[in-house]
Amino acid sequence: MNGTPINRFAVAIVVTSLLAGTVAGQKVPSSFRGADSTASVDQTSIGDLKWFDVFKDDELQKLVRTAMVNNYDLRTAVARIDAARANVGLARSEQLPQFAAGADFTTTHVSRNGQSIGGGRTRSVGSIFLSFLSFELDVWGRLRQQTKAARAELRASEEDRKTVLTIVVGDVAGGYFSLLELDSELDLAKRTLASREESLRLISARQQGGLATALDVRQAEELVYQASRTIPDIERSIEQTENQLSFITGNNPGAIPRGQPLDQQETLPLVPAGLPSSLLERRPDIRAAEENLVAQRALVSVAKKAFLPRISLTGLLGFQSDQLSNLFSGPSRAWTFVPQVTQPIFTGGRLKSDVKFAKAQQEFAVVQYQQTIQNAFKEVADALIQYRKVREIRAQQELLVATLRDRSELAYLRYRGGVDTLLNALDSDRELFDAELDLTKSKRDELLSLVQLYKALGGGWQ
């Protein structure tokens, strides 16, 4: 984790609980629910892999790299980091003395006709000084705690950027795989349409030869129109998906280059999930929640120390003379030193309310931290079972498609042999088309579940 030893101490209760098998009062499971029982439980995890080691399609990698530069959410996150870093500088500056230098020279000529004594004389007065403005001695550590809170907020904003990066990588990969699936659907629809048009031609020829009825022709036409109708709908989805990917990558709507087709995209047969305890170190949203907790604990300390006296110093050192020629001589030296102690006595309950507010914010940060951890475990468990079951569904769907393909061929052979009706052959063709579409979607779902699992395990920001 990126926190310093001081930050560790600030969340000591959390770390101690982790060593005891709990975090923020919640038990840390020894393994993820839904993990492959045949895989050994160790510290390796797909979440430790860099995104380009998981998604190996060249065109997909180009899209991800473009998104890393142009994506609006990422650019917003970077701007927030810059703001948080500036806030650290502001907090740190309050711990340091602030100096100012100044000089003034005044020349006065007194009128001869006025009432002033010494009329007609010209007088010059000058001064030059170096001063430090109200420097507070941080006796109780209030300013140090304020700076500590600002630094924790900076680290939290850096972790937030990593969280956004993980989301962007997942969104680009998910959109790309969905686009490839639509390409496969379009190819299947066009091939099916061509096949059905050929069947219609043959059936029309059989009708002319007295071997088929007008009803047979109409039924064949129905399948042609059904296949033809799906094509513009798929093309619409393709363009909309391309537009969405263009937006994620920070570009105007346009075509998206493709790499390998859907059925050639690599998946992992065995996905190691790693140890649940390592997830707490890997996921940036958990680390951000921890840093927010560190910041809120520091702000509680700041609010409490506001009851204590504040000691501030103000000083000035310089030269002053009514004659410029003597400005830098010894007798012209001047200095001022003003120590000041301020003790709040009555603030109308403001300081007590500040403490209550800070404590409430700290409790909110604790709850958010607990919720973030619990949600992380849930997301991993959901993604693991999704990945496993989608692979099982795809395997069964492949068997179903093979069976329906054989059935369709046999049904047409029986129809052409005159031992079965055309309706059975057309029904077989319709069921085969639907099953092939479902198989294409199951291939997409397998890749999408891999994306979701990678995100849930904290991958994508490395």
Where are these regions (language model features)?
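C-terminal structured "cap/appendage" subdomains that terminate the fold
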Residues: S408-T440, E446
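Terminal intrinsically disordered/low-complexity segments used for targeting and assembly
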Residues: M1-V69, R151, E235-E281, R287, ...
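Short, acidic/charged, Gly/Pro-enriched secondary-structure junctions
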Residues: R75-S93, G102-T106, V294
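A short glycine-centered flexible hinge/capping loop motif at secondary-structure junctions
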Residues: Q207-L211, Y415-V419, A456-G460
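Small/polar, glycine/serine/threonine/aspartate-rich low-complexity segments that form flexible
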Residues: A39-K56, L60, R65, D104-F132, ...
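Periplasmic alpha-helical coiled-coil/stalk elements that build and connect Gram-negative outer-membrane
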Residues: N2-G3, L143, A152, E159-L275, ...
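Regular, well-ordered alpha-helical segments
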Residues: A86, S93, E159, T166, ...
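Sec/SRP-type N-terminal targeting helices
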Residues: R75-T76, R92-S93, L137-L165, L215, ...
